[in-house]
């Protein structure tokens, strides 16, 4: 169970840069009792701002800056005073977060990337054969063309914005192993555990090495990041026992390399995996779906910054009364917490998003001092 001492010193919070997949950033201890964090899918900005998220968006820093300015203007027009994406924080534009989406680590291993005008890019690896999996090795990132290209972009970002802020989407050990190996990674856990663990080791080592190298470069620009987060989006494809026996060790290994650490669990029920997550020392962040046992999560993770991921589908299709009931449930049984509103599509009316954010304010005022 997480410690309650100095919780503000190791907590992370949910963060969605404009048009980027969600990630985490450092919490400052002043977060609202129910802090909404909305984020729009690329399709939203493609329709409303004409942004093209194809290859150029991911390789051309100046084009990305132009897009950021257009997206910021549209968000301010539609949602004045909301500070969505942190655009009114007074900080330099974040032109790193969202770069290459979830394809970052697979591309370091040589995967090709498929780009879309209105979606995040996707890695397109050929699944590793048994022979390829057995000889897989972590890439030398100091001589890796793809990763060095990212660092080169960071140089340009610093020149045009005066800062080197932002994050890459490192995903998680099982997520990336699944993308590299395909469905066979799950049968490997039964038929050839040595092979599965070899792949896990390679992925974990690459995540640690790459994160540290990125931090080193950012530190030169005065940005001192000391945390890592992982994404366990596909962990529900294995049993809780398999996670504890075969994957938890790698999450703990990554956790041990950084001052702060968080786990993105995805918007499904976290209940079967909570006990394992509770063994992670000083866990700074954990998210889950609203149908999880929120009371138990608050009890197990009292000092962790918690986050309920409220889906775009629910936001679009539930009645006002249902959403109000959901948010009061969050306030009563789970908060203080973030309320993630990610992946907003064009079918969600602006008024519905404002309603959700207003509910966070209403219930923060009502429950926050209790």
Question: Which residues make up each language-model segment?
Answer:
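Active-site loop segments of alpha/beta catalytic cores
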Residues: 1-58, 64, 139-370
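Intrinsically disordered, low-complexity extracellular "stalk/linker" tracts enriched in Gly/Pro/Ser/Thr
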Residues: 21, 105-116
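Short coil/loop linkers at secondary-structure junctions
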Residues: 52, 103, 112-114, 164
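Membrane helical hairpin/interfacial module
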Residues: 57-110
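Aromatic- and acidic-residue-enriched carbohydrate-binding clefts of CAZyme catalytic domains
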Residues: 112-131, 230-237, 309
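A gly/proline- and charged-residue-enriched helix-loop-helix capping module
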Residues: 117-152
